[in-house]
Regions:
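Short alpha-helix boundary/capping and kink motifs at helix termini
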Residues: 37-99, 109
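A short, basic-hydrophobic beta/loop patch
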Residues: 2-13, 17-18, 81-126
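An acidic, glycine-rich, mixed-charge low-complexity segment common to nucleic-acid enzymes
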Residues: 1-66
Length: 126
């Protein structure tokens, strides 16, 4: 199934077979966001999915690992707590940039969660 990220203007696909394997093909979220794991060192906050941008890597992105995506989708559908995605706020416009949690981010967008648990952390280029 094709999905569209409304503020980044790109399409991404999660195959129907993956959605069915995760029992996510008819999922309707009852909560604003997937359930985050509590981390006292790096607390998370719920952020509107439209406020998150990502670093674009390579032509034809995004590419997902099937086992990882099915696992993430399944956990979101079951309500299993997952780590918040990591973002930094280091763009001139102050937008949040996705740094870690690409599968969780795209799964949440595909499942139509309005908010995403985000842990805002500094980003360092190595």
């Amino acid at each position: 199934m094709r999905f569209f990220h409304p503020t980044e203007y790109y399409k991404f696909e999660i195959p129907d077979t993956w959605l069915m394997a995760a029992r996510a093909n008819n999922f309707i979220p009852q909560e604003q966001a997937f359930t985050p794991v509590f981390d006292p060192e790096w607390p998370s906050t719920l952020i509107d999915a439209l406020q998150i941008t990502q670093t674009h890597t390579g032509p034809g992105m995004p590419q997902f690992d099937e086992a990882r995506m099915v696992s993430v989708l399944r956990d979101m559908v079951k309500g299993t707590p997952l780590p918040a995605i990591w973002c930094s706020r280091d763009t001139p416009d102050g937008k949040l940039v996705l740094r870690h949690g690409r599968h969780r981010f795209h799964a949440a967008v595909a499942l139509k969660f309005k908010k995403i648990p985000v842990s805002i952390r500094p980003h360092f280029e190595i």
